[in-house]
Amino acid sequence: MFKKLFGQLQRIGKALMLPVAILPAAGILLAFGNAMHNEQLVEIAPWLKNDIIVMISSVMEASGQVVFDNLPLLFAVGTALGLAGGDGVAALAALVGYLIMNATMGKVLHITIDDIFSYAKGAKELSQAAKEPAHALVLGIPTLQTGVFGGIIMGALAAWCYNKFYNITLPPFLGFFAGKRFVPIVTSVVAIATGVVLSFAWPPIQDGLNSLSNFLLNKNLTLTTFIFGIIERSLIPFGLHHIFYSPFWFEFGSYTNHAGELVRGDQRIWMAQLRDGVPFTAGAFTTGKYPFMMFGLPAAAFAIYKNARPERKKVVGGLMLSAGLTAFLTGITEPLEFSFLFVAPVLYGIHVLLAGTSFLVMHLLGVKIGMTFSGGFIDYILYGLLNWDRSHALLVIPVGIVYAIVYYFLFDFAIRKFKLKTPGREDEETEIRNSSVAKLPFDVLDAMGGKENIKHLDACITRLRVEVVDKSKVDVAGIKALGASGVLEVGNNMQAIFGPKSDQIKHDMAKIMSGEITKPSETTVTEEMSDEPVHVEALGTTDIYAPGVGQIIPLSEVPDQVFAGKMMGDGVGFIPEKGEIVAPFDGTVKTIFPTKHAIGLESGSGVEVLIHIGIDTVKLNGEGFESLINVDEKVTQGQPLMKVNLAYLKAHAPSIVTPMIITNLENKELVIEDVQDADPGKLIMTVK
């Protein structure tokens, strides 16, 4: 039961990132619009009083605010899109369902606009009236206040309707309404039923949420911030942190703005107070990120670099510099956190506790800084320094310096004391268990506890996914010794990151379990092991050119933790602008994934490159891809390898960003050129 629940929570957490991703743009508009008529700034720059500038700032501020005012609707649409694989029909169904659900609740409970607004003493217009917290006016519909929870509920139901009925067949005379056209219709019926149920079920839930928020925010907010910081960081590896922080950011707490409207949620309240120009009382559940993201984690990265073996310092230095800089500037910490999460969990435990204290210290000091993207330097400028007099943002700097010192010395001590295998301190290559290509799936199956211990077997281009019967029978250390760069365990679900070999290992394991292939003889193993150095002893320099027309981005910006964390190797991200992927060098095609979304190439000097077209494109089952080459075919630099329907990928995949990584960089140096605009003739990387 837990395993199924975890899987569903992962999907929901990922779906919530779609509406959350809109908030940085809205927050920037709101922050800059508000800053342009900030009294202190206007005194310094009187030209901001110009009528045109005032109009522009007002438009920017209003444009940002309208997004925060309609978050429930955005969560409904975004959740449906995320859970239905990005299909627009599910989004339309969620929109229709959300409106119908709110209209139903309003009619069942006989809610009118007079029940929502009651004229306050001296109020002359509706906008000055006090608002009834239990009710809301949603897009002109008087209804029950369900907040973002209502949007998430309706979005999830719309996605369920889509997944259940998108391919339904109807009698010929109703054929027009068959398939996807049926989804909004059935969602409307479900929305009516949901509205009726929520009319009676939501008020006690609402009372419970209000009581919980009052307890957390009023009884002991100091302790609450500490616990919040610990749990939020603890859930990062499982991708469930989005679910955890959403109630705190979008529901808990309340504030009545200058227009008399009730605003709920720590993040939304902070934005409303920014617009009203009042002292900040919100921000307790965002401010704590700044010290450890901007200062603590980069210092931890330096400690990891310092403790790397001398011959590995150059490689580890590049990895830690890029990951630390990413954390400082943007607040994206996963590339750095995942570099030590698997190999040194004790360091992640230290990090989690320090993150909790960061939230605690910021609250005790009265620092209140909002956030939309993450707690990096960019958000710090927009929401902290531009409002330093109200946010007390300058205190982040001395606190951050203290956290940098603490992080550095604790990580340095723990790495040396416990002999942790952080990047650059891994066991020597000779200590890794030898396993030939033919024998590897047998060894992995044995490490997983044997075929009797396998409940479900799956894989993608980056990782082997196995659900086991008894986790105690799994030899995690053995799996890593066989070449997995990391093993993620959640309940009985194991994810072993073998890179491009994962799918082949899965197919071979399936054949072994069915009896189609048997274990190779010792003679076979010996022969294959003696052949392995052919691939390891790469000589010379390999120039790697762009795989097409587009943009080159750092690998740390690729929206996938396995690639961004460099678990499969180093390289770059490529954003294609034309639907043709070409060979980056002269070499041989070693692998074409069955679903055509990934290609493995080998240069004449033995450098192996993986081109993974888009993110999560394995789920497209080959749709949108046309392979122009075959395995073992010799190719020349610039030769077309794959035709890609970019429009289809943009509509059906999370991202078209294409990681291009070197998978056998051991004992080699990678030089990445300072290139942004790319075409097939432009050099982007060199392996020496």
UniProtKB/Swiss-Prot annotation:
Keywords: Cell membrane, Kinase, Membrane, Phosphotransferase system, Sugar transport, Transferase, Transmembrane, Transmembrane helix, Transport. GO terms for cellular component: plasma membrane. Residues 560-664 form the PTS EIIA type-1 domain. It is an enzyme of class 2 (transferase). GO terms for molecular function: D-glucose transmembrane transporter activity; kinase activity; protein-N(PI)-phosphohistidine-sugar phosphotransferase activity; protein-phosphocysteine-sugar phosphotransferase activity. Its main location: membrane. The keyword Transmembrane applies. CDD domains: PTS_IIB_glc. The phosphoenolpyruvate-dependent sugar phosphotransferase system (sugar PTS), a major carbohydrate active -transport system, catalyzes the phosphorylation of incoming sugar substrates concomitantly with their translocation across the cell membrane. This system is involved in alpha- and beta-glucoside transport. The EIIC domain forms the PTS system translocation channel and contains the specific substrate-binding site. The EIIB domain is phosphorylated by phospho-EIIA on a cysteinyl or histidyl residue, depending on the transported sugar. Then, it transfers the phosphoryl group to the sugar substrate concomitantly with the sugar uptake processed by the EIIC domain. This is PTS system glucoside-specific EIICBA component. It comes from Staphylococcus aureus (strain bovine RF122 / ET3-1). The lineage of its organism: Bacteria, Bacillati, Bacillota, Bacilli, Bacillales.
